[in-house]
From Swiss-Prot:
Similarity field: Belongs to the RecF family.
Pfam families given in the database record: SMC_N
Gene Ontology CC terms: cytoplasm
Chain coiled-coil ranges: none
Encoding gene, per UniProt annotation: recF
Protein name per Swiss-Prot or TrEMBL: DNA replication and repair protein RecF
Main location: cytoplasm
GO BP, sorted A to Z: DNA replication; DNA synthesis involved in DNA repair; double-strand break repair; SOS response
Length: 371
């Protein structure tokens, strides 16, 4: 899979922009705050219908416009597929082959991307919220059903939290509505937990040998999905539901005191173990970067396995974060097979062989010149 062309209308600092890309390597060169990351972001947004930089979609729309639009021509195994995402202040609409989709979950997954930016190091060393977002975004690319389940869970969680907030501090010994909300919540939460365990098993299969290769056999990476309810991947759906029910009963008084749900997948986390040690707490900066790189390369392989298409790789100002050895391993792995986009302030430090294959784009004050 590769993207042949992108058109931007009223997106960030661009009122109108059209670019054609190489199916191999595309390098955007320019100083900071010139607009090169906006192009990279637009490719990601076209694929995922959300930004990796902001949760406020209004920021994606050019300041003097009511809407923004991204159009792309994606070369897939069976031909070229036009896709389009329109962003307004009221929401987003996606089109596949010029047909508007009733749900964004039907749109996401038509173009697969793997983004590696400096902030992705936070997947390893940052907050649990970042890691949960990582899981949800990656599963969503390969499973539209998961996106639907996630939206259902978020809706039920919001309703349950509202119920707890409205009854905060009250004694609810035999409340029928409490049981109704619990039943809906437990069912929705179970779907998310099961699919996350399944995804982490698949990711582990790829990440472990990749990490071993980068570390020259010196390190073993184990990824664990940790639930606040103490659920294990071997548990059946009914066992997960029973455990959630038990933990909710135990947390009942605290939940009514605080007016918020304390048990469920919205509070779960990932743990990365290198040679048995938690890399977030005890790992060196080099080990944390190797873990992050292993995850990204594993994502590429997993998406290929599950979709039968090679995803597009976006390297946003990240090569400077990797030493020569890790950069070499990354570029050698993707050489010639994965369409790659790179942003950088200087071509120095990028391998000569990579630059020989690359299509260069010079970015200055929002103007892009192809060379």
């Amino acid at each position: 899979m590769h993207i042949e062309q992108i058109k931007l209308t009223n997106y960030r600092n661009y009122d109108a922009l059209a670019l054609n890309f190489s199916p191999k390597i595309n390098v955007f060169i320019g100083e900071n705050a010139q607009g090169k990351t906006n192009v990279m972001e637009s490719i990601y947004v076209l694929a995922m219908a959300k930004s990796h930089r902001t949760t406020n979609d209004k920021e994606l729309i050019r300041w003097d416009s009511d809407y923004g639009k991204i159009e792309g021509a994606v070369q897939k195994r069976h031909g070229i597929l036009p896709i389009e995402l329109t962003i307004t202040k009221k929401g987003k609409k996606g089109k596949i082959n010029h047909i508007e989709q009733s749900r964004l979950s039907h749109y996401i997954g038509q173009m697969n991307v793997v983004m590696f930016a400096p902030e992705d190091l936070n997947v390893v060393k940052g907050s649990p919220q970042i890691r949960r977002r990582f899981i949800d975004m990656e599963i969503g690319q390969i499973s539209p059903v998961y996106l639907h389940d996630l939206l259902t869970f978020q809706k039920v969680l919001k309703q349950r939290n509202h119920f707890l907030k409205m009854n905060q501090g009250k004694s609810m010994s035999n409340d029928v509505m409490y049981e109704v909300y619990n039943e809906q919540y437990i069912h929705a939460a179970t779907q998310i937990i099961r699919k996350r365990f399944q995804f982490m098993d698949l990711l582990q299969e790829w990440a472990e040998p990749i990490h071993a290769g980068i570390s020259q056999g010196k390190e073993t990476l184990i990824i664990k999905y940790r639930t606040v309810a103490g659920i294990e991947k071997e548990h059946s759906s009914s066992e997960i539901e029973n455990t959630l029910h038990q933990k909710l009963m135990e947390a009942r008084e605290r939940e009514f005191d605080r007016g918020v749900t304390l048990v469920g997948p919205h509070r779960d986390d990932l743990q990365f173990l290198v040679n048995g040690y938690d890399v977030q707490t005890y790992g060196s900066q080099g080990q944390q970067r190797t873990t992050a790189l292993s995850l990204k390369l594993a994502e590429i392989e997993l998406i290929k396995q599950e979709t039968n298409e090679t995803p597009i790789l976006l390297l946003d100002d990240v090569l400077s974060e990797l030493d020569d050895y890790r950069q070499s391993h990354l570029l050698n792995t993707i050489q010639g097979e994965v369409q790659t986009f790179v942003t950088t302030t200087s071509v120095e430090g990028i391998h000569h062989e990579t630059m020989e294959q690359a299509q260069l784009f010079h970015v200055k004050q929002g103007a892009i010149e192809k060379s």
